[in-house]
Structures are given as C-alpha cells and as structure tokens.
Amino acid sequence: MSLFDYSMEDIPPAANWNPVNLRLALWEISSQIIRDNWLAGIGISRMDETLQDYYSRNNFEFGLSNHFNPHNQFLQTFIILGIAGFALLVFIFLTSFKLALSKKDVLMTVFLSTFFLFSISESTFAVNKGVVFFSFFLSFFTFLPEKSTIYLIK
C-alpha cells in the first residue's frame, strides 16, 4: 500500500513534471526507503546512493538524472536517522511550540509554524543555511525575555 497514494507506474514524461507530482513521487520513494530501514535509518553517508538506487528500482529517470533529495525534512530525517531521529525532530518542534504558546510569543509561534510548514515541502536542514537559520532564530526566541519590547514599534 502506498503511503502517499501515488503510483510509480503513473510516472509522466520528463516534460510533464510539476512541483506537486514531483514531490509525490519523491515522497513515495522516500516512504519505500523508510519501510525498508525504519529502525536505524541508513545514515547520512548513504543518503544519495540509496535514493539513486530506489530511483533506479522505480524507473524514476527524472529523479535519477537530477539527484533530488526527498523534499520533506521529516521524511529525510526518518530516512537518515530512523525512528529515533524522526521522534527527536518531532519532539523539538512540539516542545518549541509549547514554549511559544506558554510565553504567548506570537512571533515565535509564527516562525515555528512557517518553518514547520516549509519543512513539509522542502528538506530545510539539508544545507547548513537551514540549520543555522533555524538554530539562530529558535535560540533567539527561546532566550528572549518574556516582557521584552524588542518587537514593539514606538
């Protein structure tokens, strides 16, 4: 059964890929990798070769020639680190949301919501810019005093 209800038999010609059907294909292949490696993952060093192998198995020539990542941070984390890494990523988001709501910090909540939603359609931590951006702003909002007027325009 397909997790994303996308059949790899329905692969369009290379000229007919769009952001939606491309991501559905990438997510379907990612779910296959997760099914085969759910406990411990495959490790960061095997990510590219494993994706290429599964693209080849599924006759996904467009993915094979373009070396796409999963375009979903949660799936990518699950592939690389297994269930423990996925659980840790979800834990980071949940505890951060809980903190933002307890502080009644609207800007932190908006930041986390935006980053969370963006992570569904992009591998945000695949490059160091995403890691630095998330780490910096999460730390900034976390350690900002609750009564801070830094957001206020006078």
Predicted region positions:
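Hydrophobic transmembrane alpha-helices and their immediate junctions
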Residues: 57, 80-113
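Short extracytoplasmic/periplasmic juxtamembrane "stem" segments immediately C-terminal to an N-terminal membrane anchor
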Residues: 1-14
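Short, flexible micro-motifs
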Residues: 44-48, 85-88, 133
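Short active-site segment of divalent metal-dependent hydrolases/proteases
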Residues: 74, 85, 125
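Active-site-proximal flexible loops/turns
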Residues: 30, 48-50, 89, 126-129
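Transmembrane alpha-helices of multi-pass inner-membrane enzymes
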Residues: 108-120, 124-154
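Long extracytoplasmic/lumenal interhelical loops at the membrane interface
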Residues: 11-36, 40-81
